[in-house]
Amino acid sequence: MASNAASLNAVRETMDVLFEISRILNTGLDMETLSICVRLCEQGINPEALSSVIKELRKATEALKAAENMTG
């Protein structure tokens, strides 16, 4: 039981550090999104490909918002 608590604490600390790095680098990722990205990388997803997908999704979101503002 103590081992599980220690492992959970280590994971939380690691995620806190990763989130701080993410914030310093101004990635715009929230803790939940960062956690999903970490899990995907742990499962073998290429981090560079994941980064490209995130950038493309952000561009598409911005384009949709711009289109809504023009028609809305």
Curated annotation (Swiss-Prot):
The keyword rRNA-binding does not apply. GO terms for biological process: gamma-tubulin complex localization; microtubule nucleation by interphase microtubule organizing center; mitotic spindle assembly. The keyword Methyltransferase does not apply. Pfam families: MOZART1. It is found in: Cytoplasm, Cytoskeleton, Microtubule organizing center, Centrosome; Cytoplasm, Cytoskeleton, Spindle. One of its GO terms (cellular component) is gamma-tubulin ring complex. Its main location: cytoplasm. InterPro entries: MZT1 (IPR022214). Keywords: Cytoplasm, Cytoskeleton. Belongs to the MOZART1 family. PANTHER family: MITOTIC-SPINDLE ORGANIZING PROTEIN 1. Required for gamma-tubulin complex recruitment to the centrosome. Part of the gamma-tubulin complex. This is Mitotic-spindle organizing protein 1. It comes from Taeniopygia guttata.
